[in-house]
Curated annotation (Swiss-Prot):
PROSITE patterns recorded: METALLOTHIONEIN_VRT
Residue numbers of N-acetylmethionine PTMs: 1
The protein's name in its UniProt record: Metallothionein-2
Binding of a divalent metal cation 2, residues: 7, 13, 15, 26
Organism: Mesocricetus auratus
Region annotation Beta: where it falls in the sequence: 1-29
GO MF terms held by the record: zinc ion binding
Any one GO CC term of the record: cytoplasm
Name of the gene: MT2
Region entry Alpha, spans: 30-61
Annotated a divalent metal cation 6 binding sites: 37, 41, 44, 60
Length: 61
């Protein structure tokens, strides 16, 4: 499995919960693809970008 678990823009996240992806720009998060982006993130559809130095993504902060 790709450790970066990159998702294409407008793609759908199907990464495992243990995946620590660095570039998650999915419009639909089926799971907590990024550790900083929880499943219940209502703004996930706007395009989350995980930052390695932060526990929260730009849209869920």
């Amino acid at each position: 499995m790709d450790p970066n678990c990159s998702c294409a823009t407008d793609g759908s996240c199907s990464c495992s919960g243990s995946c620590k992806c660095k570039e998650c720009k999915c419009t639909t998060c089926k799971k907590s693809c990024c550790s900083c982006c929880p499943v219940g993130c209502a703004k996930c559809s706007q395009g989350c970008v995980c930052k390695e130095a932060s526990e929260k993504c730009s849209c869920c902060a």
